């Protein structure tokens, strides 16, 4: 169960960006440990292998992006690091756009690359 005293950070990475996400988490482990973590399924598995506790949703194509989007609406997410592969084709593109749109609607900070992710985790 997430700690109510910690902010919640959602971590999502497309397949071509999962290695970057794991490297980012490892490079920033002291800061990342200050958050409750939630992630899409496969990304969450890799983050667990890096030694962190994470609440895993379904994988993105199976509805994980939509599950995280619902948590945005419910006020359970404080920030999102979403390392997207802008050159890839994703069958669940509507869910991705929904997550991005709801982050904007609910004014949730969203980082889509390593530079902005580094700023986001320090600012939350």
PLM features: residue spans?
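Nucleotide donor/acceptor-binding cores
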Residues: 6-8
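Short, glycine-rich nucleotide/cofactor-binding loops
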Residues: 10-18
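Histidine-anchored nucleotide/phosphate-binding helix
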Residues: 19-30
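Short internal beta-strands
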Residues: 34-43
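Short hydrophobic/aromatic-enriched beta-strand-loop microsegments
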Residues: 36, 53-63
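Ser/Thr/Gly-rich flexible loops in soluble cytosolic domains mediating phosphotransfer, phosphorylation
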Residues: 88, 96-124
């Amino acid at each position: 169960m997430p700690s109510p005293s910690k902010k919640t950070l959602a971590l999502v990475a497309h397949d071509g960006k999962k290695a970057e996400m794991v490297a980012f988490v490892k490079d920033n482990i002291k800061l990342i440990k200050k958050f409750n973590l939630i992630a899409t399924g496969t990304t969450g598995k890799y983050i667990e292998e890096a030694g962190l506790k994470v609440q895993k949703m379904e994988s993105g194509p199976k509805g994980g992006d939509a599950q995280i989007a619902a948590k945005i609406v419910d006020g359970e997410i404080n920030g999102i690091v979403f390392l997207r592969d802008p050159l890839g084709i994703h069958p669940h593109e509507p869910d991705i756009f929904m997550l991005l749109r709801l982050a904007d609607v609910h004014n949730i900070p969203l980082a889509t690359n390593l530079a902005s992710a580094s700023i986001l985790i320090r600012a939350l």
